Curated annotation (Swiss-Prot):
Gene Ontology MF annotations: 5'-nucleotidase activity; magnesium ion binding; nucleotide binding; transferase activity
Native organism: Mus musculus (Mouse)
Recorded family membership: Belongs to the pyrimidine 5'-nucleotidase family.
UniProt note on tissues of expression: Isoform 2 is highly expressed in the brain, heart, spleen, kidney and blood. Isoform 2 is expressed (at protein level) in the spleen, skeletal muscle and gastrointestinal epithelia.
Subcellular location, record wording: Cytoplasm
PANTHER family reported in the protein's UniProt record: 5'-NUCLEOTIDASE, CYTOSOLIC 5'-NUCLEOTIDASE 3A
Gene: Nt5c3a
Record SUPFAM superfamilies: HAD-like (SSF56784)
Annotated CMP binding sites: E130
Protein's name in the database: Cytosolic 5'-nucleotidase 3A
Length: 331
């Protein structure tokens, strides 16, 4: 065989090998592509808000299924059940702690320095118990009652006038989370019921969202409301105490509200504590519930517990963009 013939045979053989290799590579690519596009976490992966390092999900498949259920149900089936302090409001801004509803009153100029010192001592004593990763909710329960009862007693002694609440809130450093206008606006636009369940001070909470322009008719607030005397001076608090770990009882007391929403069987629950997980206990017919938890403090100690109990955990996250992205697809 002459050299030209040998060269032709070699070229054909080489081409055949290349074709085989190319075919294998192409098959592998197609298989990989199909596997990627066929994964159940497709919706989550397509949402850029879920790609941030602050978003932690233990079971993406379960979250995907719940979100698909929410999307399928649409506006007709949806309701929102949410905490307020450090959930809808910010935990911090530019490295500085933002106030809770109680802190807004504690820090106002109508409270004496002596009272403020005592309130701070109570916070230092009991907050450590509230976020202790070892103690059970049942063990924390009586300490929370002590804390709230003592704090409310001190505030009553100050004789806070109702007429000053608007000014007190306006002068405070309270801030709602980034994206709050979109959150409240879209929910109002579609008539979605919003149940704000707070262990804070209801009068202050309502004034915060009123001044932010988002206290719409679809929003219901359940909280610790002040009781004023005939002169408009604080004399006590109405009803039974709501604290961070008895929201289960409060939820059951609001079954009349939830029974009116029997068709709203899909729930997005927002909270920042283990106690907030019980806020939907008064809902009888739950089809899909997505629990989103903000982990603001002691992340290393509490992350595992939050990952076990919340579907989505948002670590040191000061925005509502994750829930807003879900609402965008659902409504």
């Amino acid at each position: 065989m002459d050299r030209a013939a040998v060269a032709r045979v070699g070229a054909v053989a080489s081409a055949s090998v290349c074709a085989v290799v190319a075919g294998v590579v192409l098959a592998q690519y197609i298989f990989t592509l199909k596997r990627k596009t066929g994964r159940k976490t497709k919706i989550i992966e397509m949402m850029p808000e879920f790609q941030k390092s602050s978003v932690r999900i233990k079971n993406p498949t379960r979250v995907e299924e719940i979100i698909c259920g929410l999307i399928k149900g649409g506006a007709a089936k949806l309701q929102i059940i949410t905490d307020f302090d450090m959930t809808l409001s910010r935990f911090s801004y530019n490295g500085k702690r933002c106030p809770t509803c109680h802190n807004i009153i504690d820090n106002c100029k109508l409270v004496t320095d002596e009272c403020r010192r005592k309130l701070l001592q109570l916070k230092e004593q009991y907050y450590a118990i509230e976020v202790d990763p070892v103690l059970t909710v049942e063990e924390k329960f009586p300490y929370m009652v002590e804390w709230y009862t003592k704090s409310h007693g001190l505030l009553i002694e100050q004789g806070i006038p109702k007429a000053k609440l608007k000014e007190i809130v306006a002068d405070s450093d309270v801030m709602l989370k980034e994206g709050y206008e979109n959150f409240f606006g879209k929910l109002q636009q579609h008539g979605i019921p919003v149940f704000i369940f707070s262990a804070g001070i209801g009068d202050v909470l309502e004034e915060v969202i009123r001044q932010a322009g988002v206290y719409h008719s679809n929003v219901k607030v359940v909280s610790n409301f002040m009781d004023f005397d005939e002169n408009g001076v604080l004399k006590g608090f109405k009803g039974e105490l709501i604290h961070v770990f008895n929201k289960h009882d409060g939820a059951l007391k609001n079954t009349d509200y939830f029974s009116q929403l029997k068709d709203n069987s899909n729930i997005i629950l927002l909270g920042d504590s283990q106690g907030d997980l019980r806020m939907a206990d008064g809902v009888a017919n739950v089809e899909h519930i997505l629990k989103i938890g903000y982990l603001n403090d002691r992340v290393d100690e509490l992350l595992e517990k939050y990952m076990d109990s919340y579907d989505i955990v948002l670590v040191k996250e000061e925005s509502l963009e994750v829930v807003n992205s879900i609402l965008q697809k659902t409504l």
